[in-house]
Amino acid sequence: MNKTQENALKALQQGFVASCQPVDDGPMDSPMIVAAMAQAAVAGGVAGIRIEGIENVKAVRPHVNVPIIGIIKRDLEHSDVRITPFIEDVYALKAAGADVIAIDATHRVRPTSVEDLIDAIHSVGCLAMADCSTYDEGMYCQARGVQIIGSTLSGYTGGPVPAEPDFDLITRLKQAGCRVMAEGRFNTPELAGKAIEAGAFCVTVGSAITRVEHICSWFQAEVEHAHQAQSEAVA
């Protein structure tokens, strides 16, 4: 590991990352707005930024001095893997300015092996992050030199999505010696704090910070529920 990589990991340690990924095709889905989100997040104290898409990474890079975790999302015909599925994605993210490159590291049918993607990330001098759904996936990537193991995809590979984050996975991976990025359903400050208590090296927060549509829908649902409860009480 070189000095630049060490500095990036040190910057992320026990901080939190803002995932600046607006709703696809929504009114905030433009590189200029993503760059503004990223700058606002840095002003608020984030340790790093997670950015999707080459043009967005390029737009953000000149404006922030914190580590950028870069990804590319694709909708593939014959695979459920979406996050950085191709080696050319790795090269493009590096050229755009990513410090860390995250991949889907689940044990699902994929166009490119996890091993080849990890090798490509390391070959371009970036830190590797594995977005995992299980303990076994995390340990598999840890054994192959991945520097950051994420709980990102826990609960998202089949069946109902749990309401709570997977704290057990975070703790187990930490106890096994992994540097764990807690990610997935950390939508309150309290949950983010619990991630660190559970052993996370860092925690990523997304929708609760940068997806205005989601945030508004949460408030709308609570207000509607309260109105309904009042109406039923009167009746």
Swiss-Prot record:
EC number of the protein: 5.1.3.9
GO biological process per UniProt: carbohydrate metabolic process; N-acetylmannosamine catabolic process; N-acetylneuraminate catabolic process
Pathway(s) the chain acts in: Amino-sugar metabolism; N-acetylneuraminate degradation; D-fructose 6-phosphate from N-acetylneuraminate: step 3/5
Origin superkingdom: Bacteria
Residues that span the membrane, as ranges: none
Signal peptide: none
Catalytic activity: an N-acyl-D-glucosamine 6-phosphate = an N-acyl-D-mannosamine 6-phosphate
Enzymatic class: isomerase
Family matches, as CDD domains: NanE
GO cellular component: cytosol
GO molecular function: N-acylglucosamine-6-phosphate 2-epimerase activity
UniProt keywords, alphabetically: Carbohydrate metabolism, Isomerase
Family according to the record: Belongs to the NanE family.
Summary of the function given for this chain in its UniProt record: Converts N-acetylmannosamine-6-phosphate (ManNAc-6-P) to N-acetylglucosamine-6-phosphate (GlcNAc-6-P).
Database matches in NCBIfam families: PRK01130.1 (NF002231)
PANTHER family cross-referenced by the UniProt entry: N-ACETYLMANNOSAMINE-6-PHOSPHATE 2-EPIMERASE-RELATED (PTHR36204:SF1)
Annotated protein name in UniProt: Putative N-acetylmannosamine-6-phosphate 2-epimerase
